[in-house]
């Protein structure tokens, strides 16, 4: 029976990075994965959706390039080729991870893991063959899966996993249940390609967990792009009606029905640890997620958990940071990654990127704050790109002048938020972040304008 110092269950961003980090520390490591290396992120999440959005962005820019002197008379979107490109990118990245495992001498065990005892894992392959392994420590990184609420008829709706399997034609229309990150990115993709899109959100605005202005601005932009948006709308049932699927919901105390060729259920994801533990083995749970302490320890010694299966924030980069931190703590090393500064991005058009506190969150916590803002009507790169309403906001402590948060809504926002995260992690003040010269012309120039507005308000 093979013995390892560490067995990692799950080869997503948290699991594979943790395994590689442990291997760099000369540990004998195995990774168990029943599907493709890279997990949801590389195969059914982050990367596939961004690849689709890249294709739809090209289509949109070509179709709407007349303002810049580009005219296209015969342009079409081939869905078979679009999804083939998506698969090609995912497969390249997944194969790359397997190559990294091989180079690092990490054993990649394909199959379903079952924790039979502390320090014991059984791996069952697709043909039903089982092998038992022992280890010093187990790291659970099994991620999450799409949620399906108990709504009558919801079996007629697809999850994001199912939608990403692909379709050989562009849907005439699609109804998206959920106005969060997943729903908005798919709404952007299909709207860009000319599909009739409807978004139904149960809260009072899109992106309800983010700054209020972001959700309100996004709704206006989507409506301008032809997307129908319903907020404060509660889905009652879903039913098949001929060739279409009808979604019945209440909105402003009125009964409404919208139909589409397809329906996507995008109301979030739940931690996945189904069937992970053998009878007689169980860890403490925090509702559906595995409960861990600040060292990622579960209630069973030598069993750890990181990423979506245990974290409150379900993001690939959070899982990666936690995986590396867990390995460092496990082997007596220091880890100084700031887990309280978590950037988050939405790849709609224009992009949205946030980090830290919003004004409302700061006030709710009793923190005195000032907010600086710049609407990017005068930003040259924004005018050239013609992406619509864009802005940047910064939140700072009213007394110490320390930066506490930022909200960006503009082209390439996802590529700029990392620098802001660095400022927050280092507790920089507005004045310190203003010291840097920013290039011209650039989208980043708007940061200086927003920060100057904030500095003026701080006095």
Located regions from the model:
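Short hydrophobic core segments
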Residues: 7-9, 113, 132-143, 176-177, ...
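N-terminal Rossmann-fold NAD(P) dinucleotide-binding loop
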Residues: 15, 183-184
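Glycine-rich flavin
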Residues: 2-4, 20-27, 32-171, 198, ...
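Beta1/beta-strand and adjacent pyrophosphate-binding region of the FAD-binding site
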Residues: 1-12, 170-180
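Gly/Ala-rich phosphate-binding loop of Rossmann-like dinucleotide-binding domains
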Residues: 19, 23, 187, 191-192
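Flexible, glycine-rich terminal cap/loop adjacent to redox cofactors
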Residues: 7-14, 23-35, 40, 47, ...
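FAD-site-proximal beta/loop scaffold in flavoenzymes
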Residues: 155-170, 257-331
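Hydrophobic "anchor" residues
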Residues: 48, 121, 271, 298, ...
